[in-house]
Amino acid sequence: MKVLVINAGSSSLKYQLIDMTNESALAVGLCERIGIDNSIITQKKFDGKKLEKLTDLPTHKDALEEVVKALTDDEFGVIKDMGEINAVGHRVVHGGEKFTTSALYDEGVEKAIKDCFELAPLHNPPNMMGISACAEIMPGTPMVIVFDTAFHQTMPPYAYMYALPYDLYEKHGVRKYGFHGTSHKYVAERAALMLGKPAEETKIITCHLGNGSSITAVEGGKSVETSMGFTPLEGLAMGTRCGSIDPAIVPFLMEKEGLTTREIDTLMNKKSGVLGVSGLSNDFRDLDEAASKGNRKAELALEIFAYKVKKFIGEYSAVLNGADAVVFTAGIGENSASIRKRILTGLDGIGIKIDDEKNKIRGQEIDISTPDAKVRVFVIPTNEELAIARETKEIVETEVKLRSSIPV
């Protein structure tokens, strides 16, 4: 089975074509600047050949048409025609409370995605554009929707409810949803394999650390707590997001600075985090370099980030009543040995000790803990596209079996 995985953003469309026979990526591509001047599509195939093409991409449909051309190109393509693609898997950020798993796309699923537009106004609408374009260009090809929020639907009510009047939850769906679910699920499953235990018997803390960051407590293979909340703003300090703060700061700053609701939202989401503290950058590599040269604000930004992660690891150790492993993944989690060390230093009291030399190894799954550590620490590169492809394959094959078992 060949699965096309699509992640549509407001002005971009990422894609991978994965051969599920051996779970290998045949082609990886990106359409950028959709609806903007100087649009470009880039695609790299399994043998290293790379296509770069400047072209007009007014809409997501135009972008997907270019994807079709690239995948079937005589020189840079990897298939003869789109009929070789058996299914399409789409990433959708928000599924609300309606989806605890991925779902085969139909009119009901489409309505549910649109119902969540107000919960994820920056993400669900462009996700839907990608789905609609695909339905038009590849009619008859089954599509599976994989929701970022679905993995966290196993949280108990006392974990996902806020201590606000209950009717606000009933009327507006105000509760914790959590995000990065596909990544957290993937690395938790990999960690269980590295532990040599069935997922049902594990307690794992997964740390997805990138420009957007979240931490999840996974017990028995299920999410029981996560750091992001009603929106991805809650939780850790991030690249440009402030994370959890005293809510009273919001009206205080609106009054003192004369800010509108949109302006305070922009301040917290786009101008805060390590960028806001450092006044320099949201790129942790820049901050690492600046801090090493004595930039105090860059150092403070890194200290705040590491401290918040450390607190959540301790908190989730309590939630799980002890953890078997802590996992680091995503851009920072996988690649920054210095930030991992900042986070993990001083956690020997809860059984975490790391080997400094192992911690410096990059680009592979590795146990960086010392032999005598009670809690294993794994660095596991995430692969959300493969996770989406696996979900897509499973759901499509299950649906085919169900249909074939129904008597005519």
Swiss-Prot record:
Catalyses which reaction(s): acetate + ATP = acetyl phosphate + ADP
Cofactors that this protein relies on: Mg(2+); Mn(2+)
Residue ranges crossing the lipid bilayer per the database entry: none
Gene3D superfamilies: 3.30.420.40
Annotated positions binding Mg(2+): 7, 384
Keyword Glycosyltransferase appears in the UniProt entry: no
One Pfam family hit: Acetate_kinase
Assembly behavior: Homodimer.
Protein name listed in UniProt: Acetate kinase
Lineage, opening ranks: Archaea, Methanobacteriati, Methanobacteriota, Stenosarchaea group, Methanomicrobia
Gene for this chain: ackA
